[in-house]
């Protein structure tokens, strides 16, 4: 029974601190939610030796691998996003991620020749899907799927669905960059390259997902330059444009994952143009010049909290 107090439960999963907020004291429910997250992590991760995705990668260039229906459907969705013309999203980016090692020990800027060689292994059209058998085949030896840009969104949606089944009316799940809600919540937007508690603004949402991707999340510095983890599958290098972060507000967190990556690749002007075709998706762009650009000021309930940033309309 709810007593109008917020109860917080936490765990470390998927390499991130996971936070669940409920309006009832229910440790058993929290435990079941964390078990659900762990189950999907075990299916989708590439950061350990065994998972269904790693089975696909190990069989690259040799034979198709049959996977569970949820994993197949997620890969199907990821391939569709990867095949969009000039897309910055690529489910086959694994060889580049491993080469750069950003966020892991031993990172450095790779040789240009090594980057070119890995780029040849990242063609999404060479990920062959067979819906009849639920099988996935990577055509070239050395190809690797990496669903890191999409797995959290998929899992956040499954948590939302599970909480709804349990008749939970108000809850928040934070998977580290992916926030999903039941009911109305106000959440903070982090200030790039600042203390963890520093915010540029707050956003009030109701039953929606908020996904933020920022260059400040994982990076290293070399030769006087900052190299971040958001890799451009077209060049093989970190995306280099006017953006520090992109936040996407959507019904499904999976869409948020896909669109943060797509919008990072498009940049502000093209990104705003793309969003005019999508009334179901909104975005907040934060630029290196300290502009906060709202795709739809009339729909977004955003309150600025840092006078060093200027809020402007996407159409301005």
From Swiss-Prot:
Taxonomy of the source species: Bacteria, Pseudomonadati, Pseudomonadota, Gammaproteobacteria, Enterobacterales
Function: Flavin transferase that catalyzes the transfer of the FMN moiety of FAD and its covalent binding to the hydroxyl group of a threonine residue in a target flavoprotein. Is responsible for the modification of the fumarate reductase KPK_2907.
GO annotation, cellular component aspect: cytoplasm
Gene that this polypeptide is encoded by: apbE2
PANTHER family: FAD:PROTEIN FMN TRANSFERASE (PTHR30040:SF2), THIAMINE BIOSYNTHESIS LIPOPROTEIN APBE (PTHR30040)
A single MF term (Gene Ontology): transferase activity
Record InterPro entries: ApbE (IPR024932), ApbE-like_sf (IPR003374)
EC number(s) reported in the record: 2.7.1.180
Name of protein: FAD:protein FMN transferase
Residues that bind Mg(2+): 149, 257, 261
Organism: Klebsiella pneumoniae (strain 342)
Pfam families, alphabetized: ApbE (PF02424)
Family recorded in the similarity comment: Belongs to the ApbE family.
Location(s) in or outside the cell: Cytoplasm
Chain segments annotated as coiled-coil in the UniProt record: none
Keyword annotations: Cytoplasm, FAD, Flavoprotein, Magnesium, Metal-binding, Transferase
Cofactor: Mg(2+)
